[in-house]
Each structure stands twice: as C-alpha cells, then as structure tokens.
Amino acid sequence: MAKKVIRVIKLQIPAGKANPAPPVGPALGQAGVNIMGFCKEFNARTESEVGMIIPVEITVFEDRSFTFITKTPPAAVLLKKAAGIESGSGVPNKTKVATLKRDKVREIAELKRPDLNAASVEAAMRMVEGTARSMGIVIED
C-alpha cells in the first residue's frame, strides 16, 4: 500500500545552498521532516547548478519520510542571467533595462518547457517573452 501524503511544501532555494536557517528550516520543521537530511540531499542534487534559484516540491509522508522534485529555475531568473542584469525594470512599459535576441528566448523556452504548460516550443517562447516584457526586457529578432 502506498504511503499517505500529509503535506506538499513548495520552496525556492539557491542551488547547493540549502541550510536549516529560514525559510527552509521552519517550513520543514512544521512538517516534522529531517531538515539536515533534506539539506544534504538537495545540495548534492543541485551542486552543478550553483548560482541559480531552484524551485523544489517536497512531498511529506505520514511516517515523516519525504521525496522531492526539483524544477527548472524561474523564467525571470534565467532572463536576468541571459541579459546580465541585477533586476527588472520598476516601470517596464516606460523604462527598458535590456535587449535579448529571440534565439536566447528560444534557449530559455526549451529549458523551461518541461515545467511549462505549453504544447510547443513556440507557445513556451510566448510565455517567456511575456515574462521578459513585464521585466522591461526588449526582444528583437
């Protein structure tokens, strides 16, 4: 018989840098999960992606065991890295902060596609372009 799920926790943690300090510790402590066990496993699994923020979905079972799934970094983080900027525009409709080529957007869309609800790469590209627009990044051909 399958184990009973008691909670699903969603967090965004820098790759390779999970530690028991907030926000990880309190979120997992409330669920009764072995915090250090999670941190070691997460850091080992994400050590190749250091510097990125990795969304993680932790499933906690009745016997306090857990499994977790790491997802691709948020589109906004990938766009900021590609454009070489620290943050998006405060007024994206007036102030543009960077320009990206459509090829770079395609790369990001292909990377994000498993986590996006998109039927094709073109649909995923439109989603990524929308995120870029809302950050004040101009997309050119």
UniProtKB/Swiss-Prot annotation:
GO-annotated cellular components: cytosolic large ribosomal subunit
Post-translational modification comment from the UniProt entry: One or more lysine residues are methylated.
UniProt entry tagged with the keyword Ribonucleoprotein: yes
Single GO BP term: translation
GO molecular function, one term: structural constituent of ribosome
Taxonomic superkingdom: Bacteria
Keywords of this entry: Methylation, Ribonucleoprotein, Ribosomal protein, RNA-binding, rRNA-binding
Database matches in Pfam families: Ribosomal_L11, Ribosomal_L11_N
InterPro entries: Ribosomal_uL11, Ribosomal_uL11_bac-typ, Ribosomal_uL11_C, Ribosomal_uL11_C_sf, Ribosomal_uL11_CS, Ribosomal_uL11_N, Ribosomal_uL11_N_sf
Record flagged with keyword rRNA-binding: yes
Signal peptide range in chain numbering: none
Family indicated by similarity: Belongs to the universal ribosomal protein uL11 family.
Subunit structure: Part of the ribosomal stalk of the 50S ribosomal subunit. Interacts with L10 and the large rRNA to form the base of the stalk. L10 forms an elongated spine to which L12 dimers bind in a sequential fashion forming a multimeric L10(L12)X complex.
NCBIfam families: L11_bact
Its job: Forms part of the ribosomal stalk which helps the ribosome interact with GTP-bound translation factors.
Protein name: Large ribosomal subunit protein uL11
Source organism: Brevibacillus brevis (strain 47 / JCM 6285 / NBRC 100599)
Gene name per UniProt: rplK
